[in-house]
Amino acid sequence: MSQDFLYLLSKEQLNKKFISENIYPNKNLNYYLCNDLSLETYIKLCKSGFISTSIILDNNFYLLPEIQFEYAILDFNNLHISKKVKTLIKNSEYKFCINRDFKSVLNQIQNYHKDSWIEENYEKLLINLNNLKNNNSNFKLVSIELYDKNNEKLVSGEIGYMISKTYTS
């Protein structure tokens, strides 16, 4: 992060007009702060294109929403998988799962990243988002998991989210 300052976003600013006029065109700032930890605000940030982690500044907890300057989109309808990769997947010693054990993925991320952005407040927020049912927002938190087939041990994972049919992490 190489910005000189972090702009504090309010819940009220998370609307199409403000974001279209002030955030998207700004190619100098891509990190912001948000002190509203509500599920509604987190989902609004996601739907506006932000990927949020967290930060503690002066003993205060904030979401750290990032609006990336560049994105990548995978078109799975036209995805080519080579024969070598198909064979590797078929004969793999690993099992790929989605949403099998969210809490274990969360713990693995915290253990792997010693200076983790997943501190107590952010962890609670993620757990509450994961428990969210029938929220009418087309938002769903997703844990992606890779297990060793021999011992069922979680080898790798990540947490992202889906809005409608689009996955982001």
Model-predicted segments: where are they?
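N-acyltransferase acceptor-side catalytic subdomain
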Residues: M1-S169
